[in-house]
Amino acid sequence: MCPSSFRLILSVILIAFLFVGLCEAHRHINVDIINDIGPNVQLGLHCKSKGKDLGPQSLAPHQHWGFTASLNVWETTLFFCHFVWENQSRWFDILKEKRDTIVCKYHPCVWSIRPSGPCRLTDHEKCYPCNADI
């Protein structure tokens, strides 16, 4: 392979990586979680992804807490949260990129955590069951 062809191929690959990196830098979703378990009930939660632990949080009734998640190029970004209150313990995939991107692309993904399960309030209310215990 001649040196000029090698430089051209290398330049195209470098530009492609830079372009993907710049596009990825602007892809994110904001998640907002609301404690709607009930009056006088504190909600404990701990959210994580494969590579990021957001730490334990505690929310008073109707209090909000949120985070911003960067989305990956494979559309597989996943954050899950463990919720505890009184004698209950549940977990849920609070951010699944393929499920939430269209609805939460321009507005925060707002989740109301209720005894019956989490409900996404963004766009129109949609409730989901919690994940099964393992």
Swiss-Prot record:
GO terms for biological process: rejection of self pollen. Belongs to the plant self-incompatibility (S1) protein family. It holds the Pfam family Self-incomp_S1. Its main location: secreted. This is S-protein homolog 18. It comes from Arabidopsis thaliana (Mouse-ear cress). It is found in: Secreted. Glycans are attached at residue 87.
